[in-house]
Amino acid sequence: DFRGLIARPAVNEGDAVKAGAPLFHDKTFEQIKFTSPVSGIVVNVNRGERRTITEVIVRRDGDAVEQLQVADPAGGRDAVLATLLESGLFPFLVQRPLARLADPGVTPRDIFVAAMDTAPLAPATELLLQGREEHFAVGVRALGALTSGSVHVASAPGTELPDLSATANAVVHRFEGPHPADKGGRLAP
């Protein structure tokens, strides 16, 4: 799922982990952590060719959560970047071209957010955001702190998006068409 990743384990079999605790990190960018989605015991660290980590299996045994400091987007790029790296959310930022892990040391010119899904039978964006509108707006504001340019939010025509006026550098674009109209290559200039 993460092109260019060379994983280095942060846990061993038998270790107890909390949800949000690091399981492994990237060899190239050691500050990029991949965290556990659940609390439990590490049952297996499976390896593939050339001893690369293919999966880390955690048997769930509770609801313990790693406590993280959440940065306010107004705190600037460094505060937001530190939160994304510590929480394990940074790996979901993709660097173009080639859809590789983003380099945390590089300030992106622009950031593109696909707030739409053109895949067959995909749910409507409004349903996914229902009750989470404020979280989406704060997320866009946080992404705005990471870039020196704009945060381009792409959505389908007629889609109700949360108010993004608090993010000065957010720009909403409307796209339509057959799948894959929502993919990054189509969004970027």
Which positions does each model-derived feature cover?
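Alpha-helix N-cap/helix-initiation motif
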Residues: 6, 29-31, 129
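Buried, small/hydrophobic-residue-enriched core segments of structured protein domains
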Residues: 46-189
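Short hydrophobic beta/alpha edge segments that flank linear recognition/processing sites
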Residues: 14-32, 46, 54-60
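Structured core elements
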Residues: 8-10, 24, 33, 57, ...
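Structured functional modules or segments
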Residues: 32-43, 48-50
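Short histidine-centered loop motifs in beta-beta connectors
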Residues: 6-16
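Short alpha-helical basic/polar micro-motif
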Residues: 15-19, 38, 134-141
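Short beta-strand-turn/beta-hairpin segments enriched in glycine/proline and small hydrophobics
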Residues: 1-4, 25, 32-36
